[in-house]
Amino acid sequence: MRLWKAVVVTLAFMSVDICVTTAIYVFSHLDRSLLEDIRHFNIFDSVLDLWAACLYRSCLLLGATIGVAKNSALGPRRLRASWLVITLVCLFVGIYAMVKLLLFSEVRRPIRDPWFWALFVWTYISLGASFLLWWLLSTVRPGTQALEPGAATEAEGFPGSGRPPPEQASGATLQKLLSYTKPDVAFLVAASFFLIVAALGETFLPYYTGRAIDGIVIQKSMDQFSTAVVIVCLLAIGSSFAAGIRGGIFTLIFARLNIRLRNCLFRSLVSQETSFFDENRTGDLISRLTSDTTMVSDLVSQNINVFLRNTVKVTGVVVFMFSLSWQLSLVTFMGFPIIMMVSNIYGKYYKRLSKEVQNALARASNTAEETISAMKTVRSFANEEEEAEVYLRKLQQVYKLNRKEAAAYMYYVWGSGLTLLVVQVSILYYGGHLVISGQMTSGNLIAFIIYEFVLGDCMESVGSVYSGLMQGVGAAEKVFEFIDRQPTMVHDGSLAPDHLEGRVDFENVTFTYRTRPHTQVLQNVSFSLSPGKVTALVGPSGSGKSSCVNILENFYPLEGGRVLLDGKPISAYDHKYLHRVISLVSQEPVLFARSITDNISYGLPTVPFEMVVEAAQKANAHGFIMELQDGYSTETGEKGAQLSGGQKQRVAMARALVRNPPVLILDEATSALDAESEYLIQQAIHGNLQKHTVLIIAHRLSTVEHAHLIVVLDKGRVVQQGTHQQLLAQGGLYAKLVQRQMLGLQPAADFTAGHNEPVANGSHKA
């Protein structure tokens, strides 16, 4: 809001507030002057103190207005920082007005003074307006012309207001979370019905308990006592039955919510671009998918159930409390604003802690996942104890945050518990006074005390609900952060021709990984893959060979240049079609915890078993598969753990061949095979794939030398192209690599794909 509007509105209200309060005070004290009222002030009879409270809040608003007017940049920030001050002032004045009403009721029974009621009502209207005006002044936009020059420069660096406040963000997250329950509207209606029935039944129990006591103590009638007891029994049975149904339905609703959330999150994750998985660790993503979604559904289901139940109960309890004694009801409600404020402060702090705990748990989960998935490596270095220590340190970080949560909860229980104790003692004392003075019966007092305990339990539950909801909302924000994330690389191509020759052209390709923005992996790389020909990529480790494979698979966007498939950019092809016509067999193939048949036919909707067997035979996998106990139905285990390295590579080769792909990529695909198996695979490549485009990355000379074209890469550039004999005749890098390998002077890594280029979850190959 603009500065001048906020100032005018605030000053106008202050004038109206002072005039109205003063007029009411004057008309209510026509029989004595102001000085006489001050000299002989009587708290039971005078409203001078309420008039003074009006002047005090007007002074606060005037000071806030001047501060914002003199410095429209820093002033609103200071007002936001002093929210607690205005809250406490309004809270104190509101409670004092209730006390004033009770004091007046002791000397004027009933209170029929219209001026007192006018001032009492106006006090609460003015308090609400003062609170809103304080908020209005705190929202004056920085940069609005101020009365004092230089104020804007003083506030440089003031944070923008584009981000919604935490309360608004939490409310939006909760609303979004509940929107996922729309398919269960019928269940929600049924659960709400039984919730209302159960809550109303529980609400009537204290009332009829009081009737039973009055039947004994006052009427001394066994009939009235028996009738009240029967009603209490029926109410208890009915409410228990309804509560059971309510709980069961709510549990079902939020179990369905959990499934829905996990499904949406998983679908969002698998649709992200490949670089997303380079930047986010697997353990963090798994933590979001498992622990966070479970926490969201469990906490939200439990707390919404409790919140709705207690809201209905509070409504009924308040009605009965006022019907029994409005004076005791006012005493009761004096303490609840304090409890609500304490709950609000605690809830905000707990929400922040909850986010930190979830992040710490995700880091611990990532450490555990990394260690367990690489257990053979850990054991080969005898590093079990050190890994356990690392995991323990991560858990200790979680424990430190848990201690903060425990301390915060302890202080919250102290504050709310002491406030409730003060309220209960006040009710007991003042209620005894009302019974002795004949203003209420002993049965009504006992019923009221029971209602007060019920109300206290409800408010305590609502307080814990708030902290629980904040914890659930904190986890939900992280879940929705991934659900709502739009991939930066969208696979929206639509080309899916019936016939594809398989010609691939790299034209001046320049490429940089997002995780290494200052390092160009490929620089103006150009070469072609021809149909029916085998092309080999050769070069030292880190030269960019596997990056070419990643680009051909359309895993990453290009920085410059383009990659064409049959003359069309690969990004123009349909995602499923592209990966059906281009098949990759990597050095470390990944098999899924499924049968061998399912692994070979992975990604294809329907594949005849005969085609699976034929592909396995071409990959020299059929023999060992038939030797397994369950043959093609054998479960490969997690990541193919039940198979040897060579067996996994042959199954992966069969998975690629079953597609009969126009373009086949072999990235170190025979590195784990023995000489005989490699020979058979080579025969399959050169003998059965004449009409296919084959790209090979290999370190063995026997694999490379038979290629129709060899492309030599060095430091991201193409330095040589030609056949094996041509490149040897030219000399240069290729000849050096061959010579060193033949003489045993260079490790085989010279011809490898290099293990520094990005693959999933942050490991890089170059």
UniProtKB/Swiss-Prot annotation:
Protein name: ABC-type oligopeptide transporter ABCB9
Record text about domains: Divided into an N-terminal domain (TMD0) comprising four transmembrane helices and the following core domain (coreABCB9). TMD0 is required for lysosomal localization and LAMP1, LAMP2 and YIF1B interaction. The core domain is required for homodimerization and peptide transport activity.
GO cellular component: a single term: lysosome
Entry's localization field: Lysosome membrane
Binding residue positions for ATP: 539-546
Temperature impact on function: Optimum temperature is 37 degrees Celsius.
Cross-referenced PROSITE patterns: ABC_TM1F (PS50929), ABC_TRANSPORTER_1 (PS00211), ABC_TRANSPORTER_2 (PS50893)
pH dependence per the entry: Optimum pH is 7.0.
Family that this chain belongs to: Belongs to the ABC transporter superfamily. ABCB family. MHC peptide exporter (TC 3.A.1.209) subfamily.
Tissue specificity as recorded in UniProt: Highly expressed in testis, and at moderate levels in brain, spinal cord, and thyroid. Not expressed in monocytes but strongly expressed during differentiation of monocytes to dendritic cells and macrophages.
Source species: Homo sapiens (Human)
Important for the second trafficking step from the Golgi to the endosomal and lysosomal compartments, annotated site positions: 45, 49
Enzyme Commission no: 7.4.2.6
Key word Translocase present: yes
Ranges that cross the membrane: 7-27, 47-67, 84-104, 116-136, 185-205, 225-245, 319-339, 416-436
Catalytically driven reaction(s): a [oligopeptide](in) + ATP + H2O = a [oligopeptide](out) + ADP + phosphate + H(+)
InterPro entries in the cross-refs: AAA+_ATPase, ABC1_TM_dom, ABC1_TM_sf, ABC_transporter-like_ATP-bd, ABC_transporter-like_CS, ABCB9_6-TMD, P-loop_NTPase, Type_1_exporter
Quaternary state and interactors: Homodimer. Interacts (via TMD0 region) with LAMP1; this interaction strongly stabilizes ABCB9 and protects ABCB9 against lysosomal degradation. Interacts (via TMD0 region) with LAMP2 (isoform LAMP-2B). Interacts (via TMD0) with YIF1B; this interaction allows (but is not essential) the ER-to-Golgi trafficking and strongly depends on a salt bridge within TMD0.
Membrane disposition: Multi-pass membrane protein
Top enzyme category: translocase
Function: ATP-dependent low-affinity peptide transporter which translocates a broad spectrum of peptides from the cytosol to the lysosomal lumen for degradation. Displays a broad peptide length specificity from 6-mer up to at least 59-mer peptides with an optimum of 23-mers. Binds and transports smaller and larger peptides with the same affinity. Favors positively charged, aromatic or hydrophobic residues in the N- and C-terminal positions whereas negatively charged residues as well as asparagine and methionine are not favored.
SUPFAM superfamilies, per database record: ABC transporter transmembrane region, P-loop containing nucleoside triphosphate hydrolases
